[in-house]
UniProtKB/Swiss-Prot annotation:
Annotated EC: 2.8.1.10
Catalytic residues identified in the record: 95 (schiff-base intermediate with dxp)
Gene3D superfamilies: Aldolase class I
Designated gene of the protein: thiG
Primary localization: cytoplasm
Organism: Shewanella baltica (strain OS185)
Alphabetized Pfam families for the sequence: ThiG
UniProt-annotated location(s): Cytoplasm
Name of protein: Thiazole synthase
GO molecular function annotation: thiazole synthase activity
Function: Catalyzes the rearrangement of 1-deoxy-D-xylulose 5-phosphate (DXP) to produce the thiazole phosphate moiety of thiamine. Sulfur is provided by the thiocarboxylate moiety of the carrier protein ThiS. In vitro, sulfur can be provided by H(2)S.
Protein's UniProt keywords contain Cytoplasm: yes
Length: 254
């Protein structure tokens, strides 16, 4: 069981709502994934129309919504988006995203740390999306973040665990849950993230852009479960040389 702040999750696969062909496919894929935490960009919600077809089906499915501040270019904009989410959606959970560069969508470490400090002081449950920077993740813990969400590779790139060496350090040092976010493009990569000891992964593009999103969601669900079980079982130590599995006392007693 995974616990973030005061909430327990049976599923360690978090999902998103973007890039699906329509809301019905999105809902069916999320249902198939068994995800219990789904992120949604505040900029995609039309509050003038009330709770539209993006939010209503998700709430009916019983998943927890995690609004994000995607599109914010600085701490001020991110704090505004978070406060709007709390007022309109009735949640103090927020995925903090600040990426001023529209081409590569790299998170701004300085603005993210400042926004995290402000939001934690305001009583938010903050899950910041950041570079795989062990020092930054520790600083975010210190200001009160409930979890950290280091990237595996650029958002939507499907490149996999490009930052694996740094993710290992973050996982080793973290005192809050580590959710690997962005760039996971295949179930095998999600399984690998879990084998490293990550507490959860967030996957969106790899599911939504699949030719069969519902089947792919099921594949990710199973991969995350297997990866976590492998981590808990204890993976064998990696050796630089060969290690024999049978006695080296001669051949057939000769």
């Amino acid at each position: 069981m995974l616990t973030i702040a005061d909430v327990e999750f049976e599923s360690r696969l978090f999902t998103g709502t973007g890039k699906f062909s329509n809301s019905q496919v999105m809902l069916e894929a999320i249902t198939a994934s068994k995800s219990q935490l789904v992120t949604v960009a505040m900029k995609r919600i039309d509050f003038k129309m009330g709770l539209d077809d993006l939010l209503t089906p998700l709430r009916q499915a019983g998943v927890r919504l995690l609004p994000n501040t995607s599109g914010a270019r600085n701490a001020k904009e991110a704090v505004f988006a978070a406060e709007l989410a709390r007022e309109m959606l009735g949640t103090h959970w927020i995925k903090l995203e600040i990426h001023p560069d529209p081409k590569y969508l790299m998170p701004d470490a300085i603005e993210t740390l400042e926004a995290a400090r402000i939001l934690c002081e305001k009583g938010f449950i903050v899950l910041p999306y950041v570079h795989a920077d062990p020092v930054l993740c520790r600083r975010l813990e210190e200001v009160g973040c409930a979890a950290v969400m280091p990237l595996a590779s650029p958002i939507g790139s499907n490149q996999g665990l490009v930052t694996e060496s740094f993710l290992k350090i973050i996982i080793e040092q973290a005192r809050v849950p580590v959710v690997i976010d962005a760039g996971i493009g295949a179930p095998s990569q999600a399984a690998r993230a879990m084998e490293l000891g990550a507490d959860a992964v967030l996957v969106n593009t790899a599911i939504a852009s699949s030719a069969s999103p519902i089947v792919m969601a099921e594949c990710f669900k199973e991969a995350v479960q297997c990866g976590r079980r492998a981590f808990e079982a204890g993976l064998g130590r990696v050796q630089t040389g060969a290690v024999h599995t049978s006695p080296l006392t001669g051949f057939l007693n000769q």
